[in-house]
Every structure is written in structure tokens, then in C-alpha cells.
């Protein structure tokens, strides 16, 4: 019987570190190929390879996905206005398909026989990874250790890691599960599982508490071209650099802390804490520029598309014809979304200070209540009569019955 060659989505965290040892025990003689994708998360890159090899991996691959993540995923979601259940900017959910694709690419190049991930059996990520695997490599076997192994808690995993000299940062006193990329951070587990418990200060990874944020606000100008942010305070920037800078400015001012109860793909509700400074700022700015530049029916209908797009991302069906079809619609809507938005960042809040666009549909002469008003007030009488004619007729027939 041939030995398995297993491609592992490796983060260096508790689950994937324990997983390498567990896979080698379960599949005797298996060759483990560890694959780490860089989505802009803070990590000790130099330590990942020796850690993976010391844990039992035969080889290690590090793939820089940051530019692709921004241009092919984040900007698409931003243009669509994709906020899951009106709150979550989908940082983790957006990152999973591109990580899964990178794992598939390495697995195919290395001749692997199996794909594996470190997702729990009650979370969303198992769906996102495995649906992507099925979309891109339907012939490959998939194993999900966290659905099979004997550990029933993170505390048991920590004990196992300590017993087998597996280096991990999680401790029984600090049991948070944290996932990070350039678009945001998700924090769960521990005391956060009680929805009545306020997030402890140590749960937050990058943002300053709004109460401790600077007393002087930060004002930023963000330029967009066809829905994509291209400049900050008048300086042209690559997408990656712009997001990094806004994360820094937002975090400093306590912007981007989110606490929500969300509906998971698998049918349960979960309490999630997110930090997403840049995403919060950019979604706010983009939405305000759309208010200025989009025709009324497009603006209102696009809100429905944004929810559909968010569901596609959250539910793990990124590599689908439906997502591609929605991209085509969104791209048309974004043609006029060019201009500048000025914002104030202050103690956890994002406040609109101004917006301008060469494609603005705001006509001050029509909107003003001064002598410069050019709106035809006399036309309103006939418009109202026709606009309300249906309800008037209905009431004449039905009132008094």
C-alpha cells in the first residue's frame, strides 16, 4: 500500500501544530507538506519553517498571497459592499478560498494524495476549505483531523502539545482562538463564549480602547477610482500599503472593534469579536461615495446584491458562477464611483466630513432652499396626484366597507 503524501494548511498555531504529529501517527509513514499563505497577518516568518519541520513536516512552502488577496478578493468585496449580516467585513471568510487554492496548487505540484486543514467540526472554515477543494481539485482526498481526533477541547490539545514538545503560543490561561489577515482579525473562545461578558482588554490585538484613544481626531482623505481606493491624503498608494496605513490610523483611534452574534453556515449562532480598522473605514467611505454617484434604483438594489455577495463569501462558494455573475453587475455599478471622501477618526468613531466626485448626481441648485432654487414647485402638484392615484382609488372603494 502506497504511503500518503498530505498537504497541510499550516498556520503554526495550536491546531495545525498538533495536527502534523497526529497525522503522522494516524497515517504511518505519511509525508507531510506544510503550506503557509501570507495574507498580511503578523507572524514570525523565520520561525515557521523550522517549527513545521521540528513538528514532523517533510517540507515547508511559504506563499505570499497579499497582493492577490487585495486585488482579487478584498477590492471585489468592497465594491460589492459585502458586510455579512450588515456588520462583518468578512476578513477570515475572504481569506479561506485563496488559502485553499494555494494549498491545492502546492499539492498538485508536489504530487500529494491528500488535502487537510485545521478547521473545527462546528465552524464555517471547514465548509470554505472543502468546498474550494471540491471546486478546484475534486479528485483529491480530504481529511479533517479536528472532526476525527480524540481531543474535545483546546485545553486537551495544549496538554498534548506539551507532552510531545510541540511549541505553541496558546496556554490554558489564554485560550483565545485568533485568526488574522490584512483585512481584519477574528477573536473567539474563552470567556468570549458568554455573550453577556464584555471582551477583556487582552482579547483585542491591535486596536486602542476608544477611551484611551488620542483626544485629537485624525482626518483622512480617501480617493477612489471606479470603486477602488487609490490614494490616501492625496498620495497615490498600492492597495496593500493603503490598507496597512488605514489599519494603523484606525487602530490608533480605536476604530474597527466589532462584537456580534452571527449565524454560522452549520446552523448555530456564535459570538465573534472582530478588529477591522481599514475595512470599517473603507466600507464607510465607499458607501458614502456611492450615495453621491449612483442613480437611486441602482443604489437601492445594490444593497441586496451586497448581502448576496456577503453570503457567497461567508458560505464558502467563492469559486462559483454566481459570484462571477454578481461581479459583472457590481463592476457596471462602480463605473461612476470615482471621487474623494473626507473622514474623521475619533475615539472609535468614523464621521463623514465631506465628499466630492466628478460624477456627482447631487445638484445644489435643485436641492437648495435659497433663492438659487431651480426646482419646479408647480410640477409637484400633478406628480403627487398621479403618484397617489392608486391608493386614492383603493380608499374610495374600500373605506367604509
UniProtKB/Swiss-Prot annotation:
It is an enzyme of class 6 (ligase). It is found in: Cytoplasm. Keywords: Amino-acid biosynthesis, Arginine biosynthesis, ATP-binding, Cytoplasm, Ligase, Nucleotide-binding. Pfam families: Arginosuc_syn_C, Arginosuc_synth. Pathway: Amino-acid biosynthesis; L-arginine biosynthesis; L-arginine from L-ornithine and carbamoyl phosphate: step 2/3. PROSITE patterns: ARGININOSUCCIN_SYN_1, ARGININOSUCCIN_SYN_2. Its EC number is 6.3.4.5. GO terms for molecular function: argininosuccinate synthase activity; ATP binding. One of its GO terms (cellular component) is cytoplasm. Transmembrane segments: none annotated. InterPro entries: Arginosuc_syn_C, Arginosuc_syn_N, Arginosuc_synth, Arginosuc_synth_CS, Arginosuc_synth_type_1_subfam, AS_cat/multimer_dom_body, Rossmann-like_a/b/a_fold. GO terms for biological process: argininosuccinate metabolic process; L-arginine biosynthetic process; urea cycle. It catalyses: L-citrulline + L-aspartate + ATP = 2-(N(omega)-L-arginino)succinate + AMP + diphosphate + H(+). L-citrulline binds at residues 88, 124, 128, 177, 186, 262, 274. L-aspartate binds at residues 120, 124-125. CDD domains: ASS. HAMAP family: Arg_succ_synth_type1. Belongs to the argininosuccinate synthase family. Type 1 subfamily. This is Argininosuccinate synthase. It comes from Chlorobaculum parvum (strain DSM 263 / NCIMB 8327) (Chlorobium vibrioforme subsp. thiosulfatophilum). The gene is argG.
Amino acid at each position: 500500500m502506497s504511503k500518503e503524501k498530505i498537504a497541510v494548511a499550516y498556520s503554526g498555531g495550536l491546531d495545525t501544530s498538533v495536527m502534523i504529529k497526529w497525522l503522522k501517527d494516524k497515517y504511518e509513514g505519511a509525508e507531510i507538506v506544510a503550506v503557509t499563505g501570507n495574507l498580511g497577518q503578523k507572524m514570525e516568518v523565520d520561525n515557521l519553517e523550522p517549527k513545521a519541520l521540528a513538528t514532523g513536516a517533510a517540507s515547508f512552502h511559504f506563499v505570499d498571497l497579499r497582493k492577490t488577496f487585495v486585488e482579487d478578493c478584498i477590492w471585489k468585496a468592497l465594491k460589492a459592499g459585502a458586510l455579512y449580516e450588515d456588520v462583518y467585513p468578512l476578513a477570515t471568510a475572504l481569506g479561506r478560498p485563496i488559502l485553499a487554492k494555494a494549498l491545492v496548487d502546492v499539492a498538485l505540484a508536489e504530487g500529494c494524495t491528500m488535502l487537510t486543514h485545521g478547521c473545527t467540526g462546528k465552524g464555517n472554515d471547514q465548509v470554505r476549505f472543502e468546498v474550494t477543494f471540491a471546486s478546484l481539485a475534486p479528485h483529491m482526498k480530504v481529511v479533517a483531523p479536528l472532526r476525527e481526533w480524540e481531543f474535545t477541547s483546546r485545553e486537551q490539545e495544549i496538554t498534548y502539545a506539551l507532552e510531545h514538545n510541540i511549541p505553541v503560543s496558546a496556554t490554558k490561561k489564554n485560550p483565545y482562538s485568533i485568526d488574522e489577515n490584512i483585512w481584519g482579525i477574528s477573536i473567539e473562545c474563552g470567556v468570549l463564549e458568554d455573550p453577556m461578558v464584555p471582551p477583556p482588554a487582552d482579547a483585542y490585538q491591535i486596536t486602542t480602547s476608544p477611551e484611551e484613544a488620542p483626544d485629537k481626531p485624525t482626518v483622512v482623505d480617501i480617493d477612489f477610482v471606479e470603486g477602488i481606493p487609490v490614494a490616501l491624503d492625496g498620495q497615490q498608494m498600492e492597495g496593500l500599503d493603503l490598507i496597512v496605513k488605514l489599519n494603523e490610523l484606525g487602530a490608533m483611534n480605536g476604530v474597527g472593534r466589532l462584537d456580534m452574534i452571527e449565524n454560522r453556515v452549520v446552523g448555530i449562532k456564535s459570538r465573534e469579536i472582530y478588529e477591522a480598522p481599514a475595512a470599517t473605514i473603507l466600507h464607510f467611505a465607499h458607501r458614502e461615495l456611492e450615495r453621491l454617484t449612483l442613480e437611486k434604483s441602482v443604489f437601492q438594489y445594490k444593497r441586496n446584491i451586497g448581502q448576496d455577495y456577503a453570503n457567497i463569501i461567508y458560505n464558502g462558494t467563492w469559486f462559483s458562477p454566481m459570484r462571477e455573475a454578481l461581479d459583472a453587475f457590481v463592476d457596471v455599478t462602480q463605473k461612476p464611483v470615482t471621487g474623494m471622501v473626507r473622514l474623521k477618526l475619533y475615539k472609535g468613531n468614523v464621521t463623514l466630513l465631506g465628499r466630492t466626485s466628478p460624477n456627482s448626481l447631487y445638484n445644489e441648485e435643485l436641492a437648495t432652499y435659497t433663492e438659487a432654487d431651480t426646482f419646479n414647485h408647480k410640477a409637484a402638484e400633478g406628480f403627487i396626484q398621479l403618484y397617489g392615484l392608486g391608493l386614492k382609488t383603493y380608499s374610495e372603494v374600500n373605506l367604509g366597507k
